[in-house]
Amino acid sequence: MNFRNKYVLAIDQGTTSSRAILFNHQGTIITLAQKPFQQYFPKPGWVEHDPNEIWYTQSSVIKEAMAKADVTDSHIACIGIANQRETTIIWDRETGFPVYNAIVWQDRRTADYCEELKSQGWAERILQKTGLVIDAYFSATKIKWILDNVKGIRERAERGELCFGTVDTWLVWKLTRGAQFITDVTNASRTMLFNIRTLQWDQELLDLFTIPASMLPQVKACSEVYCETSTPIFKKGIPVSGMAGDQQAALFGQLCVEDGMIKTTYGTGCFMILNTGKEPVLSQNNLLTTIAWKLGDQTTYALEGSVFVGGAVVQWLRDGIGLIPNASITEQMAKSVSDNGGVYFVPALTGLGAPYWDQYARGAIIGITRGTTAAHLTRAALEGICYQVYDVLMAMENDIHAKPKEIRVDGGAIANNFLMQFQSDICRCPVVRPNVLETTALGAAYLAGLAIGYWKDIDELKEQWCLDKVFNPQMKEDTARKLLNEWHKAVGRSQNWAE
């Protein structure tokens, strides 16, 4: 097929914004369009989105990206989707109307129910089947909450009238006007309902959470032609041929395609993923075992550490307490002081993720004196992101009994040179920043393009990976060790805080 003058459209549906990016055959960004959407916090610990607003903003940026590039449908070879994971949407199979707001991955309303499951002895069984720890983070308890708490919904679900999907499923449903009800293995692996060994929905877990199997989408590989669009956005059908959760898409976009390669994404949260190859490695250190991707019949597995609050702590400094006017000033502020002034910021604003998994931890700023300035607080917030990533890296090293050669990084925050240098200093490891920062979208584009032959194979993709900068450790090792000791003291103070 002739792909001359054709582009791949990547849909990158994130936690705070919807984006659409057009890539050319060299993996270069042609245009990018982005639109934020409303975050809803109905109660403390609750986080919701409006599914219709997700679709409205996503369809809007698709049109904007195409208009910016002055391209028509005939210039789009295929579409790839990357999405925020775990976020749970339930809608009516006939009308397509959501029955409740999307419950976002950060939402903690089911924390007490998760504790009940642990006390009933389900932790090991769920770990063996799904690779996951029991936590409100994943979709299963969110689905159950909607079925149990929204009037009339359980009865409708049992009559087969409702669909559940993560955001990828919702987008494909909308792109095909309800003709396709599918997900991919990476998104399925984050529901706590999917058996990562059999690659099937697990009936025992469906029974545990009292979720009717009829609600669940068909599970597909990450790179295959699923369908063609049938939405007014496009005048003709365009193949939808790649799909993965955002962190797995970023791992693929970074071309961490060999065992032992590792990447960290700095977004709303921070997510470190290590490619473990063809076999799942069950963590002994509170990490998640997940599916990296499935190409054809071959499934690749990964270890993941999820940090709930990464870049969101900077958002909180700006919007929550008005300490900074914008995110870009944080690098300058952090560098304006020689150290953190003894201040440690544990950004457990929605609990602590890996490796602590403390749903009742809360944010803490410790070590404040009369000499503490806004610059110290800002620096402590950035350092807090890096310390959390360090804790995940140590858990990974203990699981695989090896140190990574380097950490590839992506996400909006990696433009912050202070953050990247401090990360290298603390981890005692090179931090590698690529030329293309939009690796989540690039991964979705690669998966879609491979399925239709736009790119021949992974070797062709490897030739496109391009380095921007390597950050090597500069801090003395004993200084790093002292900082980490203080950090771990601060974490201890923040744990088990909420009732």
UniProtKB/Swiss-Prot annotation:
Its EC number is 2.7.1.30. GO terms for biological process: glycerol catabolic process; glycerol metabolic process; glycerol-3-phosphate metabolic process. Belongs to the FGGY kinase family. InterPro entries: ATPase_NBD, Carb_kinase_FGGY, Carb_kinase_FGGY_CS, FGGY_C, FGGY_N, Glycerol_kin. The keyword Ion transport does not apply. Inhibited by fructose 1,6-bisphosphate (FBP). ATP binds at T15, T16, S17, T268, G311, Q315, G412. It is an enzyme of class 2 (transferase). Transmembrane segments: none annotated. GO terms for molecular function: ATP binding; glycerol kinase activity. Pathway: Polyol metabolism; glycerol degradation via glycerol kinase pathway; sn-glycerol 3-phosphate from glycerol: step 1/1. Key enzyme in the regulation of glycerol uptake and metabolism. Catalyzes the phosphorylation of glycerol to yield sn-glycerol 3-phosphate. GO terms for cellular component: cytosol. It catalyses: glycerol + ATP = sn-glycerol 3-phosphate + ADP + H(+). ADP binds at T15, R19, T268, G311, G412, N416. This is Glycerol kinase. Sn-glycerol 3-phosphate binds at T15, R85, E86, Y137, D246.
